[in-house]
């Protein structure tokens, strides 16, 4: 694979690309990476590459130097990527996809960004490594290069390690242990010492599910939706769930029951609550049992709701935000949206037809 990095600071990449696994991959000819200075394509005697944006502060990279830099290295098979917090999230799946390309061009932004016209003309896609802003796009480019390189045959000493690493199956990896068996009173789990490979595999899967559910509920919900036909190990019954004469009831701890009643009544277009119970309309009768516990004793839950059509999906999200709930995160297909209510409960709202 060949990679060209376009940046105002090409020397920034020298040390990372000479070190460790990436350095070895370049030395062995598995990767060919060049960093180029956008200033080489600057305008006029002083090689100008930036200017003040209209109706805003700071400095912006100009369209012409950026476009000329891209066209200088671009080939028919090239894929041009702009590193930006506005892009699609970088995932293991996206890294696999990029690893199949023969030539990648990474465009690194600086200052307040890049003139939008350059992006519209020459960029194929934008990729984000997270919901935050960096001092320069070079850091993000290195992250993407490192992530995709793991899927290029020969880069890792053992390619199986790339397949087994955390997130490769949609879940966080479980804990790892080495000698000694006991350290400061903490023992290695007994199942790992017995040599029963099937039992170890079951244990690893369960621990991986538990860890993902607790630490990354967004990944856990996506995993469940992506594997609807797959048997997912059943968790122990949640004491917060109970049955009310054939109805499905979910008990939610809330700080202020009147506030929560108003919120859920309006967001679900439900009838007036009966006591502390709120009936959610739909094909399957569900009851929210609101339990006022105050702020200190409140436990938060993760819930899932699937809507039938796209209009209902977006209308529901609109009501949620308008009534004071927060919209947290969407998956890269837009089919699952994570939202939080006033009490911190996380809901995964989904619709198969949403785009």
From Swiss-Prot:
Classification via SUPFAM superfamilies: alpha/beta knot, Glyoxalase/Bleomycin resistance protein/Dihydroxybiphenyl dioxygenase
Domain of life of the organism in this record? Bacteria
Q: Do you know which Gene3D superfamilies this protein is assigned to?
A: 2,3-Dihydroxybiphenyl 1,2-Dioxygenase, domain 1, 3.40.1280.10, tRNA(m1g37)methyltransferase, domain 2
Catalytic EC class? transferase
Question: Any idea which positions bind S-adenosyl-L-methionine?
Answer: 109, 129-134
Subcellular location as annotated:
Cytoplasm
Question: GO molecular function terms here?
Answer: tRNA (guanine(37)-N1)-methyltransferase activity
Its biological purpose is as follows: Specifically methylates guanosine-37 in various tRNAs.
The answer to whether UniProt assigns keyword Ribonucleoprotein to this entry is no
* S-adenosyl-L-methionine keyword on record: yes
UniProt xrefs under HAMAP family: TrmD (MF_00605)
Assembly and partners? Homodimer.
Q: What is its EC number?
A: 2.1.1.228
Catalytic activity reads: guanosine(37) in tRNA + S-adenosyl-L-methionine = N(1)-methylguanosine(37) in tRNA + S-adenosyl-L-homocysteine + H(+)
Q: What is this protein called?
A: tRNA (guanine-N(1)-)-methyltransferase
Q: Which terms does the UniProt entry file under GO BP?
A: tRNA N1-guanine methylation
Q: Which UniProt keywords apply?
A: Cytoplasm, Methyltransferase, S-adenosyl-L-methionine, Transferase, tRNA processing
Q: Which InterPro entries match?
A: Alpha/beta_knot_MTases, Glyas_Bleomycin-R_OHBP_Dase, tRNA_m1G_MeTrfase_C_sf, tRNA_m1G_MeTrfase_TrmD, tRNA_m1G_MTases_N, tRNA_MeTrfase_TRMD/TRM10
Fetch the PANTHER family from UniProt.
TRNA (GUANINE-N(1)-)-METHYLTRANSFERASE (PTHR46417:SF1)
The UniProt entry's sequence similarity note says: Belongs to the RNA methyltransferase TrmD family.
Sorted alphabetically, the Gene Ontology cellular component annotations on this record are: cytosol
């Amino acid at each position: 694979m060949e990679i060209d990095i376009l940046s105002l600071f090409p020397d920034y990449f020298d040390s990372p690309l000479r070190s460790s696994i990436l350095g070895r991959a370049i030395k062995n000819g598995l990767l060919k990476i060049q960093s180029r200075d956008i200033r080489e394509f600057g305008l006029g005697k002083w090689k100008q590459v930036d200017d003040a944006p209209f109706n805003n502060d700071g400095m912006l990279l100009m369209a012409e130097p950026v476009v000329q830099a891209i066209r200088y290295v671009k080939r028919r098979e090239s894929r041009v990527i702009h590193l930006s917090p506005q892009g699609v999230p970088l995932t293991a799946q996206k890294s696999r996809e990029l690893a199949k390309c023969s030539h990648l061009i990474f465009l690194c932004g600086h200052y307040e960004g890049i003139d939008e016209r350059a992006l519209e003309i020459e960029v194929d896609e934008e990729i984000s490594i997270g919901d935050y802003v960096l001092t320069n796009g070079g850091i993000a480019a290195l992250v993407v290069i490192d992530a995709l390189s793991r899927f290029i045959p020969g880069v890792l000493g053992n390619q199986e390690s790339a397949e087994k690493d955390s997130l490769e199956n949609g879940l966080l990896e479980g804990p790892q242990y080495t000698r000694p068996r006991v350290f400061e009173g903490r023992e290695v789990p007994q199942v790992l010492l017995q040599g029963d490979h099937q039992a170890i595999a079951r244990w690893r899967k369960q621990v991986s599910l538990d860890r993902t559910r607790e630490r990354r509920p967004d990944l856990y919900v996506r995993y469940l939706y992506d594997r609807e036909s797959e048997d997912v190990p059943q968790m122990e019954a949640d004491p917060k769930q109970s049955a009310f004469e054939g109805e499905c009831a979910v008990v939610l701890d809330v700080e202020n029951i009147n506030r929560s009643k108003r919120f859920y009544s309006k967001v679900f277009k439900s009838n007036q609550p009966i006591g502390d119970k709120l009936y959610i309309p739909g094909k399957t009768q569900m009851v929210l049992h609101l339990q006022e516990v105050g702020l200190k004793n409140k436990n938060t839950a993760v819930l899932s709701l699937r809507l039938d059509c796209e209009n209902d999906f977006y209308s529901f999200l609109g009501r949620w935000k308008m009534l004071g709930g927060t919209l947290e995160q969407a998956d890269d297909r837009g089919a699952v949206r994570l939202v939080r209510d006033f009490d911190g409960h996380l809901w995964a709202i989904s619709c198969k037809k949403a785009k």
